[in-house]
Amino acid sequence: MNSEGLAVIETNSTRMEFSDVQHGSIVSLVDKRTGHEFLRTVKTATALWEATLVMTEGKKELSASDARRFRVETTKIGKRGTRLTMTWSDFAKPFQGVSVVTTVEYECPDSQVKFRLLRFEPGTEVGVWHVDFPIVGGIGEIGKNEEGDELEIPLLQGLLVHRPLTTIVKNEKVNHTSYGTYPGLLTMQCFSYFNENVAGLYLASHDGLGCRKDFVFDSDREGNGRFRVRNYPENMGFKGRNYSSSYPFVITAFQGGWAEATEIYRGWATRQAWCRKGRLSQRSDLSNWFRNTSLWVWNRGNADRVSPGPIELKKKTGVNVALDWYWWHHNPYDVFVPEYLPPREGALTFAKAVEKLHAMGTKVVVYINGRIWDMNSGSWDEQRASKAAALDENLKPYEEKYNIFMPENVIAPMCPTTQLWRDKISHLVSALMEDFHLDGVYIDQVAIATAELCHNPEHGHPVGGGHYWVHGYNDLIRTARDGARKANPDACLLSESCIEQFIDSFDGFLTLDSSWERTGANLDLSWDKMGLQGQTWEPIPVFNAVYHDYAITFGSYTSMTGVPPYDDLWPESGRPREFGKFATYNDKYPDQFAFELARTLSWGIQPMVTNVYPEMLGREEFDADMKFLEEVAKFHSVAREYLTLGKWLKPPEVDCPCVAVKMYIRSIYTAPDRISEMVRNSPAVLTSTWTTHEGSVCVVLVNFTRDPVNAKLAMDLNEYGFEPDDRITVSDYPRSGVQTALPSHKLEKTVNLPGRSIVAYEFSAK
């Protein structure tokens, strides 16, 4: 503790000060490289931790500032590290038995600063419900008037929020809060708040087990930014049970933007258990046909509507095509799950349709949901499903509703640790694979939905918090995958969204982020409230930046038609009046389809198109979209070494015009009178960069507009893994056979891209 009553942690990049007077609150956080102070001076500093505790009379709040005794001890770690140990005790009744110990440390001057909740002792008559730790308040703007300030959130593939203090902290429409759950919609544990021209702050938990936690960016008492992590102990609320988090939290300053922050996270993440099978190029357990697919068709309905689209696209493109088939099942979509069998057209008709698709060279994957059971279904009572349901703190099943056309149906998430649910899904997968000779099963929701806090004491797992949800589903998936492989040794299991915890269990992940604007109306994630027209957010490929060479992603929601399908098993009264009428929105939104498809390719995602039905085939108004789809699929097919197996690199600077892409927002449950639109400003040319582990680098430029574009490409190849004395050659890609030696490692090149075209260059060292 220095003369000013401050305990200091100082690395080469970061200086933090903790106030003795304010019970260990972080009162200064400085990027040492630039001298930027991230925290504003406040009247009352934010407590380093807050807790909700349980007593006989109910729940009460407690924080570090309530302690009447606080002490800090500074010790050395090894030769060059430092650890601060902070202890809070002597709380007023009824918390007189509470004692809390945390540490803040670094191992050497070049390392990150790690926070640990070492021990939370509640005393004999108190239980710990949850603990918010660490908490950093007083966060201010980085750039002047927030110009250039960004917040990266690992929501699905990734979300970039512009001017986050204005967009979130000062925004009453979102209750001054951005909140997410991991595992769940938050697919990783790394956040970054940065201004590329000034400094950045990396905020993450490094938890290899997958414990349930919530990340919150909100407002402190004085209207500044605040970042906190809510941690849920095993056996929540049990009196006398001490709590220690099994994972550290990392807060450190860095230089750059979200790409540089992902490199920090990748250094930890790719050493975790979910990457233990190695990079994609090293893995022998993945489905080969899935690895080599370059075009997906997502269709819904009976065979005569579903099959012609993928068959026609297979003929047109010649690439490996796969069908993701929805609404093949007995039950109406999103209700009466998991009563999928028999197929709604009958087993024989369905089997013949699969056989025909195979004969035409198309792989077939069918949809099921791997997480929920409809409490209105007959099987709920017959199979005593309530015993396997995840229960809330009142020992009632969590309740959800999805189908707006059948709102009386209530859905319950199931607990993956229960044998009933494991058997239900694994037996269903085996039956589908054995009876219908499928190529795989897409298991919805498992990788996207919240890891519920299950309070059922009969399930055998810790009550409430912990990592049992992830481990339960990993066991379930592996069992189901083993069963599928008995019927088809090259079968794949896929799931919705992308999440690190299931990388080594699922073969791949369906991600729709390249069509995020289109699907926004179907998800209650508040981005419409964040000023959709104001360009306050945009999707970014954070997950693929970290894991592209470890996990395969596929998908988009892009469609050439403006009318979503309507399940024939839903009530006729809810059918939109335009259903069954052919409609295209290409005249009003001429660039949306190509923009979403270009994003998909640029992010290294296997391309997908949705809702390709017989009435669309051969129509002149779709010729341009079909031609671009064909070009994208063919390019992906020849570039799989980069676009499926390669490591993502930060794209170089490309100077090109910016265009306004007019987009409509409509998902499957969007009524005709609820359709909305927005404008997304984007460079006319989307750029991505990839490397193989042999060291070659490929730069891909995609012009999604209808007009030719001249783009100026500038690269310093020393920033892409090449050594200063390397002799570098460049060639067109796919390889033309002509290699040109570069006179310098700094490349400046004007690239002429025709409308809706792809140009790529490959760089190699001699």
Locations of regions flagged by a protein language model:
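Active-site neighborhood of glycoside hydrolase catalytic domains
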Residues: 413-504, 517-520
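Short, acidic/polar
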Residues: 302-315, 421-434, 593
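Active-site-adjacent "subsite" loops/lids of carbohydrate-active enzymes
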Residues: 355, 366-436, 520-536, 540
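Conserved structural scaffold segments of CAZyme catalytic domains across common CAZy folds
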Residues: 78, 88-96, 112-114, 119-141, ...
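Acidic-aromatic substrate-binding/catalytic surfaces of carbohydrate-active enzymes
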Residues: 4-94, 103
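C-terminal beta-strand-rich structural cap/linker in extracellular carbohydrate-active enzymes
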Residues: 742-766
